[in-house]
């Protein structure tokens, strides 16, 4: 069973996963980098204030001055600086404790209850005192006469740089996901629009969709749809052309056979009947041959025409083809010859290549008068492939008609020999299928006509963007 697939859901899932990943990275950064750095920053502030007080006490002593008033003033200034840095006034109460060298408490801002007692070696850390948790940071100076500790309650510090629990993280995440749903839905609207454009078309409408009106991201899909419709339209046109050609070309021989059959019913003389039957046989043979050629041409024009690509010894295969036509050439008193490179091997479809050359050779023999010559030549173009040239010194074709030789059913005016006019069209289509080029050249002795099969070293199918030469 085919599973449910939704591009919308796929987009949402990937976006939500990306947001969750980024969200997790943000939380990890806040927890493991941002907050520890802020803790160090505030601890360092406390340590600087403690160092300042310790330095003053080292210089002035505690005997002759009101050191408690000095510490109280510094404490007030510190509280004011914190409050001034906040947008909203807070009830900020730090803890200031001063110890002498004997660890006696000389000053404590906590006037209620027992003052904070710490071991002599402690300058920083966290303690629970007076019902609250405190961050402690302190300092000795060079004389080590006085140890000053400045404490900040956990609650005050949380107020200073915010409590993560106060931020509605889940609410923000939910809002982001809902926003993603809306943006993904509206972002996919162009896909739904192009789907409607295609579904609203009439079945026979294969005209291309306007690509310039589409969004950049959808254009490749629309272009491929246009190419598909173009291929379907071309296939339809080929089918219509085949039906029209078949009906047109078969009408004449079939009509002739029907007329001869009607005449046969009225003739009683045996010799005349045999002549009519012979004419009927020729007409039926021509119709059968024409049908085969039409079918072959239709197969060639199909996109799925099968090819069997293999290494082909060109000289050997062309030699075999010429050898098969020698009896017919001898019968017509026509000289056949083959020369050129004997070591040419290319990768192509052997049957298609032989069919091309056979069509050309059949035409040359058909129109060659007695005593004429037909020469085949193979020229290596390694590593680019080879030329297979077939030339004769027969009647030839005038320049004005050469450009139409590869058209279907085209026959040079004034031609006496019978034929359907499909042979060269089939050869040209076969050449296109194997990536070769078939073109006209000059004949022998300033007469006749020639054809060149330009065969590449290896098979390379012709793409839609490559024009036919």
Swiss-Prot record:
Summary of the knockout phenotype: Mutation in either rssA or rssB confers a precocious-swarming phenotype on LB agar: swarming occurs at 37 degrees Celsius and is initiated at a lower cell density and more rapidly than the swarming of the parent strain at 30 degrees Celsius. Both mutants also exhibit increased hemolysin activity and altered cell surface topology.
GO terms of molecular function: ATP binding; phosphorelay sensor kinase activity
Keyword annotations from UniProtKB, A to Z: ATP-binding, Cell inner membrane, Cell membrane, Kinase, Membrane, Nucleotide-binding, Phosphoprotein, Transferase, Transmembrane, Transmembrane helix, Two-component regulatory system
Cellular-component GO terms for this entry: plasma membrane
Location of Phosphohistidine modifications: 248
Superkingdom of origin: Bacteria
Keyword Cell inner membrane: yes
Annotated compartments: Cell inner membrane
Segments forming domain Histidine kinase: 245-459
Transmembrane segments: 12-32, 167-187
Coiled coil: none
Catalysed reactions listed for this entry: ATP + protein L-histidine = ADP + protein N-phospho-L-histidine
Matches recorded under Pfam families: HATPase_c, HisKA
EC code(s) of this entry: 2.7.13.3
Function: Member of the two-component regulatory system RssA/RssB involved in regulation of swarming motility which has been shown to be inhibited by saturated fatty acids. RssA/RssB regulates cellular fatty acid composition, hemolysin production and cell surface topography. RssA/RssB negatively regulates the activity of SlhBA. It can also act as a negative regulator for the control of the swarming initiation.
Protein name, UniProt field: Swarming motility regulation sensor protein RssA
Protein source organism: Serratia marcescens
């Amino acid at each position: 069973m085919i599973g449910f697939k939704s591009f919308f859901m796929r987009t949402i899932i990937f976006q939500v996963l990306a947001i969750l990943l980024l969200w997790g990275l943000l939380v990890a950064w806040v927890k493991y980098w941002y907050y520890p750095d802020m803790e160090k920053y505030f601890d360092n502030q406390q340590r600087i204030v403690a160092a300042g007080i310790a330095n003053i006490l080292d210089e002035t002593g505690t005997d002759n001055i009101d050191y408690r008033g000095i510490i109280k003033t510094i404490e007030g200034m510190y509280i004011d600086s914190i409050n001034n840095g906040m947008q909203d006034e807070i009830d900020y109460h730090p803890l200031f404790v001063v110890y002498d060298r004997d660890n006696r408490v000389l000053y404590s801002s906590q006037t209620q209850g027992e003052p904070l007692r710490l071991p002599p070696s402690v300058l920083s850390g966290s303690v629970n005192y007076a019902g609250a948790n405190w961050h402690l940071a302190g300092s000795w100076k060079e004389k080590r006469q006085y140890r000053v500790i400045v404490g900040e309650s956990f609650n005050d510090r949380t107020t200073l740089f915010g409590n993560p629990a106060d931020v509605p993280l889940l609410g923000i995440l939910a809002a982001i996901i809902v926003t993603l749903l809306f943006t993904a839905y509206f972002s996919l609207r162009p896909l739904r629009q192009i789907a409607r454009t295609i579904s609203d078309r009439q079945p026979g409408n294969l005209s291309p969709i306007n690509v310039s009106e589409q969004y950049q991201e959808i254009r490749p899909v629309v272009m491929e749809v246009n190419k598909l419709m173009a291929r379907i339209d071309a296939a339809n046109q080929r089918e219509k052309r085949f039906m029209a050609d078949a009906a047109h070309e078969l009408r004449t021989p079939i009509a002739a056979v029907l007329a001869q059959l009607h005449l046969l019913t009225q003739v009683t003389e045996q010799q005349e009947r045999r002549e009519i039957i012979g004419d009927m046989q020729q007409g039926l043979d021509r119709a059968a041959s024409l049908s085969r050629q039409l079918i072959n041409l239709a197969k060639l024009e199909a996109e799925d025409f099968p090819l069997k690509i293999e290494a082909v010894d060109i000289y050997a295969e062309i030699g075999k083809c010429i050898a098969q036509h020698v009896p017919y050439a001898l019968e017509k008193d026509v000289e056949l010859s083959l020369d050129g490179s004997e070591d040419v091997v290319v990768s192509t479809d052997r049957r298609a290549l032989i069919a091309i050359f056979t069509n050309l050779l059949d035409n040359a023999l058909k129109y060659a008068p007695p005593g004429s010559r037909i020469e085949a030549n193979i020229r290596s173009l390694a590593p680019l492939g080879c030329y297979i040239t077939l030339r004769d010194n027969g009647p030839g074709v005038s320049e004005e008609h050469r450009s139409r030789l590869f058209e279907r059913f085209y026959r040079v005016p004034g031609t006496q020999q019978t034929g359907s006019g499909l042979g060269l069209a089939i050869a040209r289509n076969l050449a296109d299928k194997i990536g070769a080029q078939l073109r006209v050249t000059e004949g022998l002795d300033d007469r006749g006509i020639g054809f060149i099969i330009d065969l590449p070293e290896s098979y390379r199918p012709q793409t839609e963007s490559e024009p036919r030469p």
